[in-house]
Amino acid sequence: MVKKYLVTTALQETWPSSQSQIIFLGEWCKLYSNKSYWNNLNYEVIDYHWDNREKFEIIGISFNSKKDQTKERLIAAFDKFIDVQNKSNDEIVYLSKNLNVDIAIDLMGYTQKSRFAIFEKRCAPIQINFLGFPGTTASKNMDYIIADKCTINDNEIVNYSEKIIYLPISFMATDSKRRPSKKLFDYKNYEFPYESIILCCFNKYYKITPEIFNIWCNILLKFKKTILWLGKDNHAGIQNLTKELKKKGINENRLFIAKFETKIEDHLARIKLADLCLDTYPYCSHSTAYDYLVSGIPLVTLKGNSFSSKVSSSMLESLNLHDLITNSYTEYENKISELISSPEKIIELKKNIEKNKYKSTLFNI
């Protein structure tokens, strides 16, 4: 893929820097806790390069290398792993050049505590934006972005400063070992009312806009057996959401906050309790969409025009679940209502997801 998309003319003289024809691939990342999307879903992006170690040397550059058991697996996948947390941007650029890094892949973009100045200073002849920042960096020094035809269609290429490297079907990377455990959860674990219809969203609260929450409230008012199951985030967010429910005349006991699960496999297993997962907009589910689908639960999404609003749609398309993709607030609310009104459709969707998910390209890196 790299050979197909050559570096700019100004940089061609410096690439490749190694006479041994080994390509050095710098993975520039910040290692978070074991809940981190990158840690949990991208092991095999690195692991599968072991089949090409005569062509690639994989170097991990971390801005925060606090270790736990989850990270140990990731670190072990690299040929070299270097903690640069206490180094300056100039020192990191110097290190990269000293390591003869030919390709640097940025996994953070402009997200919190990123070090994008490193890429502005040109730490490698080829620099690629992947996964961490779902959109253009608008930087002349970021050469490429990895995407698919859903997240960046032909008409949108003009909006990107980067050249587009298209992956087939979906650009999302996954981990075949990230699967639900065999642990059984039931309504009693969360004190859900018997025969309730569980609507789930485990996105961070900052993604829940007033427009989306208003639609969820409309659904709760329309279907009396529905409850809303959210992930645990900040206390102020829970208070604000509860306040909004009360304003609309909805009993706060229909809002349930998930307990923290230490094992990701158990977290995925409990998602199976949900009847339907609801997406946010305009910043939709990314790693959480993967979690819903690998757990076998359908997700209704609202597809927008930005990269960040189309990641869920990309994954749903890879599973041929086009009917779960909506294009307006009205369509979104109507689709949720339609499925709740026809529980047999939800059952059929769950069966189809379970039957086809491991055959799809999404779950086959």
Question: Which sequence ranges carry the predicted segments?
Answer:
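C-terminal terminal-structure detector
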Residues: 164-172
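Nucleotide-sugar donor-binding and catalytic loop/hinge architecture
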Residues: 2-4, 180-199
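Conserved donor-binding/catalytic core segment of Leloir-type glycosyltransferases
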Residues: 5-7, 193-209, 213
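Short hydrophobic signal-anchor/transmembrane segments that target glycosyltransferases
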Residues: 45-52, 199, 210-224
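Conserved nucleotide-cofactor-binding alpha/beta core module
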Residues: 8-141, 149-157, 229-363
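Acidic anion/phosphate-binding donor-loop and adjacent secondary structure
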Residues: 153-159, 172-189
